[in-house]
Amino acid sequence: MVTIGTLGSHSALNILSGAKDEGFETVLLCEKSRKFYERFRVADEIMYLDSLSEIKREDIQEKLNERDVILVPHGSYISYLDLDFLENEFSVPIFGNKFLFRFESDRELERKWFLKAGMRIPRTFEPETIDRRVIVKYHGAKGGKGYFTVDTPEEYFEKKIEGDVQIQEWIHGVTMYFHYFYSPLQKELELTSIDRRYETTADAVHTFPDREPTYVVVGNFPLVIRESLLEQVFDIGDKVVDASRNLHEKGLIGPFCLETIVTDAPEIVVFEISARIVAGTNFYVPYSPYTYAKYFEPMSAGRRIAREIKMALEEERIKDVVS
């Protein structure tokens, strides 16, 4: 019997509770400092590690493979594990397409994906060509850490930036993060939920108006969108799924998120993608308005993942949903 597992971080409660809903055994790989998971009932087994990177150890991988574990990836896999190792040496099956994680970790590759999809995206700038407000972003899934805004080349160079960054046009509008699920078994795209992020100190700048805002994500707010805009939401989702097959033969599998700004046009401008589950889905356990309207039963993102794994096992197509 397959066991569903994940790393103890990010959206583990969502993932494992959904797996339990579908009748799977569960295992959590967790740092020793995070004892709080014992207070919940989602993990049948907790494997404590000194650090999450220990999942690279051969003996850990062997133990997981002996238990027939399928790991469900989330943002911590992108932040803390080496992508070359994950793609080429890691032997435990990963739900979804791990070969697309590189595209969300490198903003230039991500931009090429969006251009192939034909979506509206922000302009990018070189430091010397900044002529309007821009937001400067580091590569990778770091929850907004280190992002900042500038208006001129002089302001940019004052920051004495270290490391690779992308300079994006600042789009005026509201942020909305659309959570999708693509089923290769049913060849269908679903909208599972929507959120916006609670960021420090951007969401508290009114308290200290003279302080430069930062964008570290500490939580998420649930949202619904005007129903008249749902056509745009599905359109951009379909486009990014279609374009993903040009990047890797399997394309997108399972949950992903398009991070957007909705302008007053109204137009949806896409600025980032996460090619796996995002923490904004955590609010929607056991269901969202959109999953309820489709399934008429509790259906969280975690449960939808487990349902896809269950269907793949029943149809003997598990290779179609893992990498």
How would you label these PLM feature ranges?
Residues 244-283:
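Conserved metal-phosphate-binding beta-hairpin within the catalytic cores
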Residues 38-133, 142:
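Conserved N-proximal alpha/beta basic substrate-recognition cap immediately N-terminal to
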Residues 303-323:
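Cysteine/selenocysteine-centered motifs that mediate thiol-based redox chemistry or coordinate metal-sulfur cofactors
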Residues 7, 99-193, 226-238:
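Active-site nucleotide/adenylate-binding loops and adjacent lid/helix of ATP-dependent enzymes
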Residues 1-4:
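Extreme N-terminal starter segment of soluble prokaryotic enzymes
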Residues 179-244, 274-306:
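ATP-dependent carboxylate/phosphate-activation module, predominantly the ATP-grasp catalytic core
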Residues 15-24:
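A short, Lys/Arg-enriched amphipathic alpha-helix followed by its capping loop at the start of a domain
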Residues 25-33:
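Short internal beta-strands
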